[in-house]
């Protein structure tokens, strides 16, 4: 006898509704204000270009300027010029053992060179190590230098013990001296201890630094004005894009058709903006937002609504990728399946016009892989099966979604060629490192909620059973895995690299979003009120006061 709807026991999650309603559908484009801002930015841009290219600027002054531009969020206007400067400075082979270069300067230069892929040695910090192999006690009064060392240490790779020690020393000392520092340095330290620069979302970090820089007695008013204007101009563009995807989402009306799923289109746009915020990636942001939003529904269908018979059919339908499969699907998922195929038809048509139809093919194949892994996970849950950690992790690296989202992040990037998609399909070291970070940090943040919902096949549970470990030991191990994976990402970003820097930056920025979204072991995507709401308001609602 067929199972009736009444008899079906569904694993309903009862997700909270969207925080935003129709707020971003009612967007005022502000075209006149944008035009005015754009003209002002272009004028200021010429002046800053002269500052960067000035031949008379010395190493220390030029590096300080580059750091300020990057932290104010305006360096994307001058990427070529900054790279040329850094290449020139790196090839000078500066002797950083010279007493002229203090801890602040050496740490800043190390960080900038590493951020731009230069293989500068961590041995340059050796002059601050005492006879016992520890950082010198005298450094504990140098708040500015310690903060610079702290930020630099996050770009370490495996085996750089001196930077592991630097992070431990700087973190402990900064926590101790922060209450005694003067503003704005104290504010900068407190923020950095919560959110290291290298792990942070570039736009959030720019917003924060603008307010700190404004308090700086040595600030350049010209740069500050440029940063504020540019921030607000970019915000106008992002609001237009958010308006577009919000309208698309409302017209699909999947919220009413699939009430079990999370309604998070705004948070999905926040995610996409974190991958690339620059104006030239406007189309890519919109395409990525749509794919993330659809993935979220698939995730909730497997995790929080579907029963195994339905999921068997749905998995087959995704594999076959044919509109005729709709007849076999459960009624509730038919509108979604149709919308998903139509979305990719639109992508394929658009990409075919520029000779990049292969991009959609790689994205669809990656989505099929994701769905197969979701299916495995769902069967584990329904069967009450707790896999060995190695078996769990192999599948969970796919269900973290980052393999698929890294691929779809390149859909709207015209410079992304087929070789880039082929590279990702082979799951290179940098991508695997990114998947590991996403997986273990997500597992830590969602463990308690999943446990309450009866989810037994979690990474934490699997690790604890295999290793006879406590919850505290498992969490510590997961953080250790994430730390090592970050070191691998840092290594893979160094030159020479056969891979496109554009692609490497997408992976790096995706990991930064994980650090922000799951801050404090909170699931900021599922419950955005505490973690993401303030960021979304700062980025997409409130302009910076001039």
From Swiss-Prot:
UniProt keyword terms in alphabetical order: Lyase, Magnesium, Metal-binding
InterPro entries: Isoprenoid_synthase_dom_sf, Terpene_cyclase-like_1_C, Terpene_cyclase_plant_C1, Terpene_synth_N, Terpene_synth_N_sf, Terpene_synthase-like, Terpene_synthase_metal-bd, Terpenoid_cyclase/PrenylTrfase
Tissue specificity note: Highly expressed in leaves. Expressed at levels in flowers.
Cofactor note: Binds 3 Mg(2+) ions per subunit.
Binding residue positions for Mg(2+) 1: 299, 303
Pfam families: Terpene_synth, Terpene_synth_C
Enzyme class: lyase
Family: Belongs to the terpene synthase family. Tpsa subfamily.
UniProt free text on domains: The Asp-Asp-Xaa-Xaa-Asp/Glu (DDXXD/E) motif is important for the catalytic activity, presumably through binding to Mg(2+).
Oligomeric and partner information: Monomer.
Full protein name: (-)-5-epieremophilene synthase STPS2
Origin species: Salvia miltiorrhiza (Chinese sage)
């Amino acid at each position: 006898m067929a199972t009736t709807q009444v008899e079906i026991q569904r694993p309903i999650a009862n997700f909270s509704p969207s925080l935003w309603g129709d707020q971003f559908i009612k967007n005022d484009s502000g075209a006149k204000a944008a035009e005015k801002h754009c003209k002002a930015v272009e004028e200021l841009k010429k002046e800053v270009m002269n500052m960067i290219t000035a031949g008379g600027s010395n190493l220390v002054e030029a590096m300080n300027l580059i750091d300020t531009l990057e932290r104010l969020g305006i360096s994307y206007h001058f990427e070529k010029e900054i790279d040329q400067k850094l290449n020139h400075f790196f090839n000078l082979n500066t002797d950083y053992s010279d007493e002229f270069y203090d801890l602040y300067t050496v740490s800043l230069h190390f960080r900038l060179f590493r951020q731009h892929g230069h293989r500068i040695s961590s041995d340059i910090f050796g002059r601050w190590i005492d006879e016992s192999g520890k950082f010198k006690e005298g450094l504990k009064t140098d708040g500015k230098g310690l903060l610079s060392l702290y930020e630099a240490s996050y770009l370490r790779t495996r085996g750089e013990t001196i930077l592991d020690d630097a992070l431990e020393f700087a973190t402990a000392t900064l926590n101790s001296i922060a209450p005694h520092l003067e503003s704005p340095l104290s504010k900068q330290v407190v923020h950095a201890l919560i959110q290291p620069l290298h792990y942070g979302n570039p736009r959030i970090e720019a917003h924060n630094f603008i307010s700190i820089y404004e308090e700086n007695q040595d600030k350049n008013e010209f740069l500050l004005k440029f940063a504020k204007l540019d921030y607000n101009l970019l915000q106008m563009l992002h609001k237009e894009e958010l308006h577009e995807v919000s309208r698309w989402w409302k017209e699909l009306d999947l919220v009413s058709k699939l009430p079990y799923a999370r309604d998070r289109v705004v948070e999905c746009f926040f995610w996409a903006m974190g991958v690339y915020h620059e104006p030239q990636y406007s189309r890519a942001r919109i395409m990525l937002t749509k794919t993330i939003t659809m993935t979220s529904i698939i995730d909730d269908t497997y995790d929080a609504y579907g029963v195994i018979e339905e999921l068997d059919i749905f998995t087959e339908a995704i594999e076959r990728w044919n509109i005729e499969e709709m007849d076999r699907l459960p009624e509730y998922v038919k509108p979604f399946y149709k919308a998903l195929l139509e979305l990719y038809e639109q992508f394929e048509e658009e990409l075919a016009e520029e000779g990049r139809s292969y991009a959609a093919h790689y994205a669809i194949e990656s989505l099929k892989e994701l769905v197969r892994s979701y299916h495995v996970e769902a069967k584990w849950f329904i069967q009450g099966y707790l896999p060995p950690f190695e078996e769990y992790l192999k599948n969970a690296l796919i269900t973290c979604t980052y393999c698929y989202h890294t691929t779809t992040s390149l859909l709207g990037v015209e410079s992304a060629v087929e070789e880039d998609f082929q590279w990702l399909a082979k799951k290179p070291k940098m991508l695997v490192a990114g998947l590991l970070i996403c997986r273990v940090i997500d597992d830590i943040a969602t463990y308690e909620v999943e446990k309450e919902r009866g989810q037994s096949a979690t990474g934490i549970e699997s690790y604890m059973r295999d290793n006879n470990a406590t919850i505290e030991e498992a969490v510590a191990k997961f953080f250790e895995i994430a730390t090592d994976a970050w070191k691998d990402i840092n290594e893979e970003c160094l030159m020479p690299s056969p891979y496109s820097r554009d692609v490497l930056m997408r992976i790096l920025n995706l990991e930064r979003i994980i650090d922000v979204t799951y801050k404090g072991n909170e699931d900021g995507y599922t419950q955005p009120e505490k973690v993401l709401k303030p960021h979304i308001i700062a980025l997409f609602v409130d302009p910076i006061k001039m």
